[in-house]
A protein has these predicted regions:
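Hydrophobic alpha-helical transmembrane segments
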Residues: 1-529
């Protein structure tokens, strides 16, 4: 978010082409006609019948989660961020599209069988206009038109493949998650995972294609973003292929395939960056003293985390809840210095850690020796009621939750100057995950344990715990303001108070995965401070 990095893409999901702008009205009409002709030939989304769906035990549908990602990306359309180059409109428009498609998942795909049969017995057929408006790929057409008007992609037909791919990925990935990993997600959680994958892969592909078609000199932050985009695409193809070709899940095939994907990824990234990736990474680590400091600090925190986990497993004295909150504190200590000193470097490290955890989960689920058993034993101390399905995602949710503001930010992430005072709408949104989960959730748990007396209706959470979580967030922000690291107006304090209170209430009452929900909920209002 440093203005000097003006040519960097907006986070790992950013990137835009330098195609010539503007097109005639006749070309627009021709493009729309071609798009309307193509739409009826597109496949319908595979149905997910609610009565047959094996969702996470004890969780409500959580359909309201489908609006969180679009709301978090909506600031990309604000005039406040018009100075960013390229404009973050593409990410925001695609996010709105996956939000509408996410609602379609519930409205059309997740109806109970009885409701479907009742509609058939009525023999009522939708009028052509209604069939068009409710077609699962209609949002793709609308988004392609908006992209042609608001971004530097001048023609809806050029944008349509991108928007169609985004919708297809959302439907396909969501369907795959529910059918392949039963009992691991609520409806809302599965939808938000599908939205995230669709948005990340689509924006990453666009960034790579733009780099190939319209090469230009890259800024440092742009290089990091392009490297992350390449990693996202390679990782997605690798995981998709593993689950499409059963032979690749055999131990003697898995490791060679993993090596091949690594070589391909390094080669592709080297071509896109114009520099051999290992050398580029070495230069990246030595870019500034702050990065060396962060590496040392993160190494010490990793040793502490591994040591306390090993001790807890041997002694069996530390309750699971306490051990999990210790990791909340550790990740807070990881992210706060990173955001304040080197947000772009933190972005790269957080993305790499998340991908590593996802890869380890694939190894564990597929029981690939000799690592699967070791991984399962390492994850055992962190399991809770939300990990009763096939997947164990609590640690990934925690890491992804605190990292999500870095991935969604509409402006480039650059190097912070030590001692520089950030505007509140620049640094606080990047700390949304830390404030909501690392600070608020942890303080709520500790406060509820020792001070809690009045329980929220229908839950084990206490009002006192929620108040502790809210106050803790405000105190941390106050410390940042007092240290001169953040400027916050009086009106900003009021909005922060309301946002922290809302997050505290949701944390107490929701049965969805709060490590993902809370950061997204806090991020959006913090962008308006």
């Amino acid at each position: 978010m440093v203005h000097g990095e003006a040519k960097a893409p907006a986070g790992p999901m950013g990137g835009a082409s330098n195609a010539s702008t503007g097109s005639g009205s006749q070309g627009m009409k021709h493009s729309l006609k071609a798009a309307l002709t193509t739409l009826p030939t597109l496949p319908v989304a595979d149905p997910l019948h609610l009565s047959c769906l094996n969702t996470r035990s004890g969780a409500s549908t959580g359909v309201w989660l489908v609006v969180l990602v679009p709301l978090a990306c909506l600031p990309g359309l604000y005039n406040t961020y018009r100075h960013c180059h390229p404009l973050p409109h593409l990410q925001a428009l695609l996010a709105i599209q996956v939000g509408v498609c996410g609602a379609h998942l519930y409205q059309e795909m997740c109806l109970a069988n009885g409701q479907k049969m009742a509609k058939k017995e009525e023999g009522q057929q939708k009028p052509p206009l209604l069939r068009f408006l409710t077609h699962p790929y209609t949002p793709s057409l609308a988004t392609s038109i908006a992209i042609s008007l608001l971004t530097d992609i001048p023609d809806p037909v050029l944008a349509l493949p991108l928007t169609l791919l985004c919708s297809w990925l959302l439907f396909r990935v969501t369907h795959w998650l529910f059918t392949t990993f039963p009992g691991s997600f609520s409806l809302g959680e599965g939808a938000i995972m599908g939205q995230s994958v669709a948005l990340a892969v689509t924006c990453s592909l666009h960034g790579i294609i733009s780099r190939i078609l319209w090469p230009q000199k890259l800024s440092h932050a742009h290089e990091i973003s392009l490297f992350i985009q390449t990693a996202i695409v390679v990782m997605s193809v690798m995981v998709g292929t593993i689950y499409s070709v059963p032979m690749l899940r055999v131990p003697r095939m898995f490791l060679p395939y993993l090596c091949v994907c690594g070589v391909v990824g390094v080669g592709l990234a080297s071509l896109l960056l114009g520099e051999w990736v290992p050398l580029w990474l070495w230069e990246l680590l030595n870019f500034s003293p702050a990065r060396l400091f962060l590496l040392g600090w993160w190494f010490l925190l990793t040793l502490f985390a591994v040591s306390i986990t090993t001790w807890a497993r041997r002694k069996n004295h530390l309750p699971t809840t306490v051990l999990r909150k210790v990791y909340h504190v550790v990740i807070t200590l990881v992210f706060i210095p990173g955001v304040l000193l080197e947000p772009s470097f933190l972005l790269l490290a957080a993305t790499a850690a998340t991908m590593a955890c996802l890869l380890l989960e694939v190894v564990r689920v597929e029981k690939i020796p000799p690592f699967a058993e070791v991984i399962s034993q390492a994850f055992t101390p962190f399991l809770d009621e939300k990990d009763e399905g096939l997947l164990v995602l609590s640690h990934i949710y925690l890491l992804a939750g605190v990292s999500s503001p870095l991935w969604l930010t509409p402006c480039p992430l650059g190097e912070a100057k030590v001692g520089e005072a950030w505007q509140a709408n620049a640094v606080l949104p990047l700390l949304a995950g830390v404030l909501a989960v690392g600070i608020g959730d942890t303080a709520a748990s500790v406060g509820g344990t020792y001070l809690g007396q009045r329980r929220w209706s229908g839950t084990k959470k206490t009002v006192e715990g929620s108040l502790c979580g809210m106050v803790a967030q405000l105190v941390v922000v106050g410390v940042l303001v007092g240290a001169g690291l953040v400027h916050l107006s009086l009106g900003g304090w009021g909005r922060l108070l309301v946002s922290a209170a809302l997050v505290a209430v949701v944390e107490a009452l929701t049965d969805q995965v709060d490590n993902i929900v809370l950061p997204l909920m806090l991020y959006t209002p913090l962008m308006d401070l």
